[in-house]
Regions:
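Positively charged n-region of N-terminal signal peptides that target proteins for export
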Residues: 1-5
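Sec/Tat signal peptide C-region and signal peptidase I cleavage site
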Residues: 18-24
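Signature of the catalytic double-stranded beta-helix
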Residues: 125-139
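N-terminal secretory/targeting leader peptides
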Residues: 25-125, 140-356
């Protein structure tokens, strides 16, 4: 009797088990991180849009539950180590700037190779997405070489130049120590300045102690990292809004996720990508006003100064494209597509670069 009852209960349990996947009974934990802190717009959107939206939609539309373990501002990975953090599985999802991967992702700074592009982050991320969609290598390289999947592009706000000294023409910058990150250091080099590689978390102390006297930076960085305290001058030179950050997920972790959870992550990531454009664009004028209110001298230089700087860089895009082409990368194709996409969107270059 007891044996019969036991067999019956085991049979029922087996039926229930077969009907209910093990994964449906598990909580999915994902570690998400960035070396930058939440005062950065894209990290703020990771924390306050991507994470809660994925959590909510998975709970509402599936039998699963997602819990995120969050680590920003270098708590889990540093700014220059995030690609490797995702690659190794130390974290599952990472947001980072390709500027810190000049060897691993040299072509992904392609908008930087065409300075004085659109100052609209909305337009920038749309242009970048159009190019990524036409050149599969740009997305596939993450999976093929770095064991991660690119799920969103991230736009920055428009880059300008903040300094602790006043300047009015490009020649005023000659010999000045100015900071940047990755390939945008070339903008400084061609202008005659002394470029210094740096990152936002160290910017305040570096300017305070005279390591350098200015930064290629968008206004949110000048506001949120209080750089106005050590750099009184913020000059709108209009280098362009650059899309050269990304959000990636470890490939092995991705493969283990249920299909419906994958679909929701991609859905939210697409919205997140668009928001990096719209939120940055909405905040730009507010941040300039905030800087003025804090005593910063905010000026917009005449178009002829912008054109002079562009002329100093006239041959660089073609040179850089040839250099990367020689490494087997589709650089000339990517730069040509970017120029065309920007012009189709209505952008007028101060100098029309020739890359072929």
């Amino acid at each position: 009797m007891k044996i019969h009852a036991l067999l019956t209960s085991l049979a029922v349990a087996a039926v229930v088990s077969a009907a209910t996947p093990v994964s449906a009974q598990e909580t999915i934990r994902l570690r998400i991180a960035s070396g930058h802190p939440p005062v950065n717009t894209y990290v703020n959107l990771m924390q306050n849009f991507f994470v809660p939206e994925v959590t909510k939609r998975v709970a509402e539309r599936t039998k699963h539950k997602v819990e995120f373990v969050e680590g920003y501002g270098g708590a889990m990975v540093k700014v220059a180590d995030t690609l490797e953090g995702v690659q190794s599985g130390i974290i599952d999802i990472g947001g980072y700037c390709f500027c810190f991967e000049p060897s691993n992702l040299p072509l992904h700074a392609f908008q930087v190779m065409l300075p004085f592009g659109t100052m609209s982050p909305v337009m920038s991320v749309k242009i970048a997405r159009e190019v990524y969609d036409q050149v599969p290598y740009l997305s596939k390289v993450f999976e093929d070489k770095y064991r991660q999947k690119l799920i969103a592009l991230i736009a920055d706000n428009g880059y300008n130049l903040g300094t602790n000294f006043e300047w009015n023409k490009v020649s005023d910058l000659k010999g000045q120590k100015l900071a940047g990150a990755g390939l945008n250091l070339k903008w400084l080099e061609y202008a005659g300045a002394t470029p210094v590689q740096s990152s936002l978390p160290e910017a305040y102390t570096a300017m305070q102690t005279g390591v350098y006297n200015g930064w290629i930076m968008f206004p949110s960085g000048w506001v949120n990292f209080k750089l106005y305290e050590v750099g009184k001058y913020y000059t709108e030179i209009g280098f362009g809004a650059i899309t050269w950050h990304g959000l990636t997920i470890n490939s092995a972790r991705w493969a283990k996720l249920p299909k419906e959870v994958q679909d929701i992550i991609l859905e939210v990531a697409k919205e997140y990508e668009a928001k990096t454009g719209t939120v940055n664009e909405e905040n730009y004028p507010k941040q300039l006003e905030d800087l003025k209110a804090k005593g910063t001298v905010v000026r917009k230089l005449p178009d002829d100064v912008r054109a002079d700087w562009a002329k100093s860089l006239a041959d660089w895009p073609k040179q850089k494209a040839k250099e990367l082409d020689a490494q087997g990368l589709p650089a000339t194709q990517v730069l040509a597509l970017t120029l065309a996409a920007a012009e189709k969107a209505g952008h007028k270059w101060p100098l029309r670069y020739q890359v072929k």
